[in-house]
């Protein structure tokens, strides 16, 4: 999970851990690239310092990594941004817990 908002990271992590998932987090795209190592799924905020979601996605894909990316953003154009970076899905903040769990189940298990 890549998000610069610690409260979002805490809430999403708690939900996913309760559902039996492992969660690793990074505060920005640059940190996430350094940590990237065979993730089942990347939950990605688009507006972050240092390296934003667009930069992360470009470098992540250029490195040959193919983990699904789900954009998580409060911006009205979340769907368009997801399409622009080649993400498999998107969640518009604020999102419902059920939508988060469904997206993780769908994309992390390869049933998309």
Per-region residue spans from a language model:
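Charged docking surfaces used in two-component/phosphorelay signaling
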Residues: 10-14, 18
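Acidic, metal-coordinating helix/loop segments flanking the phosphotransfer/catalytic sites
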Residues: 25-41
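Acidic catalytic/metal-coordinating carboxylates
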Residues: 27-28, 51-55
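Active-site residues of response regulator receiver
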Residues: 45
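Receiver (REC) domain active-site loop signature in two-component systems and cognate sites
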Residues: 48
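Alpha4 helix (beta4-alpha4-beta5 surface) of REC/receiver domains from two-component response regulators
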Residues: 55, 76-91, 102
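C-terminal output helix
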Residues: 95-105
